[in-house]
């Protein structure tokens, strides 16, 4: 019984190989590009490989269907599989390392300011204040007395001469101006600073009137004229002054006092004229 089954299986296998080789040769002869010898050789190798693959697939199917628990019957190369997996994983690892570099923490700390928690609230730490030397403070104070605002060239020149940055000079002038305004409102500025700064209206001298003359007029030759005792000044104002709105009778004495001082000058001139 077994001999009959073996003979039938071999006949079926031979018929399958023959039919496959015949179909391959027939199709290959129809192609105009390949010669006959090449077609025959290729059909032989393809037919043998096809038969081997078919037998292997049938054996795997049979072992899987009748013996599902025996996985050892399936032939595969675990070494090749492991090497392929390792090589692909290694390639992925190198790509990840080159494409995504890890950021450095010190750079973040340098760019971001330090933050401290004060009463449960974040607060940025201020930079330390600039400590000016006595020479720098004296030079800045002298320049502030001359002018309270500096142009860009002046600020750059002053900063270079004192060894400071322009920002430090700018901040010093801003703080000094605010302090000066606060003292000026409270009336605590000394007299020398008022005259030097020139901001207060009282520091500027009052404008001199056009008709005011010095108390001791001088002649052309440089000799002073001796004053003569005169009576009380005339408080009566001329008639043309009453036409102006700015004139008041209380100011008549102050405006007419210089005119009384001119009288000795004219009288002395007249007396000298009579001598000659």
From Swiss-Prot:
Classification via Pfam families = DLL_N (PF12413), Homeodomain (PF00046)
Task: Give the annotated DNA-binding region, as residue ranges.
Answer: 125-184
Region entry Disordered, spans: 97-123, 191-238
Q: Does the keyword Hydrolase apply?
A: no
GO cellular-component terms in the record? nucleus
Q: Give the record's keywords alphabetically.
A: Developmental protein, DNA-binding, Homeobox, Nucleus
Which Cys-Cys disulphide bridges does the record give?
Answer: none
Some GO term, biological process aspect, for this entry: which one? embryonic morphogenesis
UniProt superkingdom = Eukaryota
Biased composition of type Polar residues is found at 218-238
Q: Which GO terms describe its molecular function?
A: DNA-binding transcription factor activity, RNA polymerase II-specific; RNA polymerase II cis-regulatory region sequence-specific DNA binding
Q: In its keyword annotation, does this UniProt entry include DNA-binding?
A: yes
The Swiss-Prot or TrEMBL record describes its family as follows: Belongs to the distal-less homeobox family.
Q: What is this protein called?
A: Homeobox protein Dlx2b
Organism of derivation = Danio rerio (Zebrafish)
Q: What is the lineage of its organism?
A: Eukaryota, Metazoa, Chordata, Craniata, Vertebrata
